[in-house]
Amino acid sequence: LLLLALAMFCSYIFMDILSPIKDLMQETRGWDSTAFGTMQGSEVFLNVFAFFLIFAGIILDKMGVRFTMVLSAVVMLIGACIKWYAVDESFMGSGLEAWFTNHLNYIPVFEELGVSPFYAGMPASAKFAACGFMIFGCGVEMAGITVSRGIVKWFKGREMALAMGSEMALARLGVATCMIFSPFFARLGGQVSVSRSVAFGVVLMCIALIMSIVYFFMDRKLDAQTGEAEEKDDPFKISDLGQILTSSGFWLVALLCVLYYSAIFPFQKYAVNMLQCNLTLVAPDANSFWAKPDVTIVQYLIMLFVAATGFASNFQKKAGAKYGLLCVSILALVTYCYMGYMRQSAESIFAVFPLLAVLITPILGSYVDHKGKAATMLILGSLLLIFCHLTFAFVLPLFKGSAIGGIAIAYITILVLGSSFSLVPASLWPSVPKLVDAKVIGSAYALIFWIQNIGLWLFPLLIGKVLDKTNPGVTDPTQFDYTAPLVMLAGLGVAALLLGFVLKVVDKKKGLGLEEPNIK
């Protein structure tokens, strides 16, 4: 579980490696919001339109967890290397740059629909980076379904929701790591270089590959010791898809997934820039303690301490140890927030996003395992999502002139959004085995990820387009008005809320068992 979580931790960092430096991409590479959003959405383009994710599910069912995990890590590394070269200085002025400038300027059908993965006027570096990100996206989504399948293999009938929640909580620390270190490497030494941030991500993808290989041999050794063959599902048949697609519960869970994740992951890619636009941030004096690079490292170590103590508190049997660790974790979190305020750094403010998730996801997972109520948790998650996006849209801008008030509201809202994000992996993913036959779980997860990927491709692109349309003539990347994109994301939360109520009714009528505990 730890090896799989660490591999996903590295992939989560690379997934959002450019998100906290959107302003620098506009200043140094000429990427406007449309180019940035189009590149970010490209991550899942092949998964959606080449149906790669469906094939990934078939590979997983046929070849097993070990092989598919290593394959996904190799694919991620190839895509990461291409993306690094695309934003590196050596790409500028190359023959490859000239080719991309002159080609991929019109994609039939997509151009007419206004959602083309490439378009005339899109910077060549953004086009080539999008190609690399498409390949990376194939690997990361394959890894996602493989990890879910691996956890089902080891934890079915036991604390499966706790295991999935714990894996996602640890992996999501990658988001915070990315938010802190991507700008750190980009500005290291006083000279801006966006390629340094991506190079940092490439190194981490090499580590993810090593983790996957270690998992391969450890899992094989364990199977040899127990005398079990690696669990592979029955040969894939088209009729299996029919079995999955005829389940109304499956469709409701899949639609909930696409609505919910589309309101979170695309938002992450713009969140730092949104804070830069809505907060009054004054950079500390260059000679002050808070401007030193060492402070970034210290703040990150405190963040890890918050996560470690909060996570560990879930597994203490003695009340004294449990609440003691919890208090220490909260004190460390307050210290982290104070440092973010003193540094006046939008990226370190948003980095608190997964911290509450790390603390409460295992609690929620354990609750679903022993008490149930998965459908109710999905409804609660949707309510929190709506509240947070509307707060960002209408309340946060009111405090733009207030140095303390704006940052305080930002911290609270981001932490609540992170907690709403915890409700989904702890309740949604463990529900899938209740909806489909065990032999097609790999394909079922792949189908859900494919449906989810439609939203993850479309909404980064839409946010970028809406930003450019509602901010005509704005060239300063810290002066955008984010109201319209945030209202759009809140609308997704409303749709998810309605579907949550429908799911609860269907569960009660058909006895799907979503409200029942995983451990009986």
Place the predicted regions along the sequence by residue.
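Extracytoplasmic gate region of multi-pass secondary transporters
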Residues: L18-K22, S247-A312, A332-A357, T361, ...
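Central cavity-lining transmembrane alpha-helices of secondary-active solute carriers
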Residues: G41-I58, A351-L364
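Conserved MFS/SLC helix-loop-helix module at the cytosolic interface between two early adjacent transmembrane helices
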Residues: A50-E97
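Cytoplasmic membrane-interface "Motif A"-like loop-to-helix N-cap segments
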Residues: D61-A73, Q316-G324, D369-L383
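Flexible cytoplasmic inter-helical loops of multi-pass small-molecule transporters
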Residues: W99-F100, F216-D240, K510-I519
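Cytoplasmic helix-loop-helix junction between adjacent transmembrane helices
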Residues: A126, G132-L170
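Helix-loop-helix hairpin linking two adjacent transmembrane segments in secondary transporters
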Residues: E167-R220
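C-terminal transmembrane helical hairpin of 12-TM major facilitator-type secondary transporters
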Residues: V328-G340, S345, A351-L356, A374-L428
